[in-house]
Amino acid sequence: MSLKIVFAGTPQFAVPTLRALIDSSHRVLAVYTQPDRPSGRGQKIMESPVKEIARQNEIPIIQPFSLRDEVEQEKLIAMNADVMVVVAYGLILPKKALNAFRLGCVNVHASLLPRWRGAAPIQRAILAGDRETGISIMQMNEGLDTGDMLAKSACVISSEDTAADLHDRLSLIGADLLLESLAKLEKGDIKLEKQDEASATYASKIQKQEALINWRKSAVEIARQVRAFNPTPIAFTYFEGQPMRIWRATVVDEKTDFEPGVLVDADKKGISIAAGSGILRLHQLQLPGKRVCSAGDFINAHGDKLIPGKTVFG
C-alpha cells in the first residue's frame, strides 16, 4: 500500500533513505531539511545533500529554523500525511509534530539502541572499541532517542573501519530496514520493543579538542581515535610546531619500552611512534595547506627531522 510521507533529514546519511522512498510505491509529500548554511573555506552558502535530492525530484522543500513555531506545526498537520520519516534531521520535533501523523514519526538511528543514543553514535562506537553497531528503526517520542523500536539490524565493525566506512554502510542498511518497517507498520504486523533504560549509553557530539592525540594513551586507543575521526574532525598531533593530521594509522605492537611520543622507526611501511603502551604506525599524514600524503612521501620531505629515539610528534 502507498503511504503519504513527510521526510525530514539533512546530511548525506539521510540520502539513501530518501532515495529509497522516492523509488518506492510511497508518496513523499514534502521534505524538511535544515536551512542553507555557509560551508567550507570560502563559507559559501550550501544546500544540504537532502535538499539537492528533493530539488532534483521536484519535491516541495521546507526549511524552518525551528518547528516550535505554531504556524510551522499547523503547516505540518495540514499535509495530512500518514507518517513522518526522520533521518538525522537536526531539529527537535515538539509533541504537536510528533502527534500529527496516523502512524507517528519513525526515526532511522545509527546504533543498536539503547546503546549510543545521541548525536555521534558511529564515532562513539569506534572510540569505545565496539565489535558491532547497527541501525535501529524507532517510533519517536519526546525523549532523545528513547522511543520504542520497530526493528534493528546489526553491522560488524572491523579493525580497519573508519567513521566514513561505517557511515556509508549503515546509511544503506537504514534505507532497506526503513522500507521493511513501514510495510509492517502499515499492516499492523509489527511488535514494538521497549528500550532497556539500564543499558542506555549516550553518544555526545564530537568536540574538536577530542581529535588531539595524547601519546600516553595506548596505541589501540589512538588507532581507534584516528578511525573514529576520519573524515571529520581528523585526529592530529604536532610536528615542528604545526598541527599534523593523521588520516590512517595501524597498531604494530601492543607493548613497547620506548617513552610515549618517541619515534621508533620510519621506513616505507610507515612512521612508527611509541604510545603509552604499544607502537602506532602512521600511514597517511597531512600538514597545514598541504595534501594528504603517504608516510613514504612524508619521509622523503622531512626525513632529516625523523630521528629514531627522539620525540618528534606531540
From Swiss-Prot:
Reactions it catalyzes: L-methionyl-tRNA(fMet) + (6R)-10-formyltetrahydrofolate = N-formyl-L-methionyl-tRNA(fMet) + (6S)-5,6,7,8-tetrahydrofolate + H(+)
CDD domains: FMT_core_Met-tRNA-FMT_N, Met_tRNA_FMT_C
Annotated EC: 2.1.2.9
GO cellular component: cytosol
Gene Ontology MF terms in the entry: methionyl-tRNA formyltransferase activity
Binding site for (6S)-5,6,7,8-tetrahydrofolate: 111-114
Top EC group: transferase
Keyword terms, alphabetized: Protein biosynthesis, Transferase
PANTHER family associated with the record: METHIONYL-TRNA FORMYLTRANSFERASE, METHIONYL-TRNA FORMYLTRANSFERASE, MITOCHONDRIAL
Family: Belongs to the Fmt family.
HAMAP family to which the protein is assigned, alphabetical: Formyl_trans
Primary role: Attaches a formyl group to the free amino group of methionyl-tRNA(fMet). The formyl group appears to play a dual role in the initiator identity of N-formylmethionyl-tRNA by promoting its recognition by IF2 and preventing the misappropriation of this tRNA by the elongation apparatus.
The protein's name: Methionyl-tRNA formyltransferase
